[in-house]
Amino acid sequence: MKSIKFRLIVMNFLIFAVWGAYLCSLGIYLGSIGMGANIGKFFAIQGIVSLFMPALMGIVADRWIPAQKLLGICHFLAAAFMALAGYMGMRYGSAVTFGQLFPYYAISVAFFMPTIALGNSVSYNALTQAGLDTVKAFPPIRVFGTIGFILSMWIVNFTGFKNGYQQLFVSAAWGLILAVYAFTLPNCPVNKNVENKSFVDTFGLRAFSLFKDARMCVFFIFSFLLGMCLQVTNGFATPFLESFGYYEEFTNAFAVKNSVFLSSISQVSETLCILLIPFFLKKFGIKKVMIIAFGAWALRFFFLGAGSPTGFGLVLFILSMIVYGVAFDFFNISGSLYVDQNTDVSIRSSAQGVFMMMTNGFGATVGSLCAQAVVNHYTYPASKIIDGKEVWFTIGNWPTAWYIFAAFALIVGILFAIMFKYKHTPEKQ
């Protein structure tokens, strides 16, 4: 049993190491090659492919290809296309165009996004075969995914790859290792006798009937609105921190030179704040917990707008990273638990799919594109020569952009408090 737990720990570590190599630093690279105005598109594509690729790969895993093998195939393809994106960056340097870089990146992301769910399936199957309780055994294993994400961020930060195409090669390398490793994992048998389902049932669309319930409808709408916040800091926090490097007085500041490391505090906080959820849900209930999440997002954005790389401003940056854990966990995990407790067992999995679709699909996509429009309005690209090389930064009125994001989260939180009707009963938590 210890052996299978360790093997699943390695798998989860690698899955999220692939993601951590670029998710929080890609914006820096794009900004450095004068492509800052397209950051939103690179992050929106994650939401777009999340709308259909996990469901499609889930069908393939159920009927034709064992989940562990499909996991390996997806990571091999994702790594190959990410390496091609890195090659384009290496070959053309700062002259690389959107058309040369984006297609390879988009295809890579399309094959990567389903692997999170596939990894969960492999884990659940292996733990069940070993006679272990998945509810108790899986969370400690999943924590190592976050550790992999953080370690990958640190590697990219301290090697200096955060500023260049090399981060894409790091992601590809992790992916290739996992592609090989996945084929050694315990077999997940396919169900060749699976019944033919309708299109509606196959894609879990029957769960959309939940929108007929007024309270669930309000919940899902606000899930979409809060989901708009999710990719904002992933896409723009580190380019914002790096923008201070344009100004001589901040060029050597720790927050500028180690922007990705500073950002990783967010992931550490996310890991620790998971431990607070049971207490807060029991004590306050889902409504107050989600209101806290909206408030935390507002503070997250406000602290970024008010901060600076030195002195008390650096303290505000650190506070922004710490409060991210509350903002993310109190919404994503608590919201998922609410859906689980308030839907019929026959559509519970599909309902979770709707929740993820509203947040990481529609919400993240619309949020990325809207955030890009705001950032483009208040900032502009500018370059300077550093060590004989032209480096681009996105500079301008960043604080106003962050304050707009903070105001959005605050207003949506107030509307949620008014419109979401819920009576907390502690004994049900």
Set out the residue ranges of the language-model regions.
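Helix-loop boundary and gating motifs at the non-cytosolic
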Residues: M1-L51, R215-N252, N258-L262, N332
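Central cavity-lining transmembrane alpha-helices of secondary-active solute carriers
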Residues: K41-D62, F261-L276
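Multi-pass alpha-helical transporter architecture, strongest
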Residues: L56, A85-M90, G175-P189, G361, ...
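Juxtamembrane intracellular "pre-TM" segments in multi-pass secondary transporters
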Residues: M1-K2, P186-I221, Y246-T251
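Cytoplasmic membrane-interface "Motif A"-like loop-to-helix N-cap segments
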Residues: D62-F76, F280-F294
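C-terminal transmembrane helical hairpin of 12-TM major facilitator-type secondary transporters
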Residues: K288-G335
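A membrane-interface helix-boundary motif in multi-pass transporters
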Residues: F158-W174, A373-A409
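C-terminal ends and interior cores of transmembrane alpha-helices
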Residues: F76-A95, G295-G311
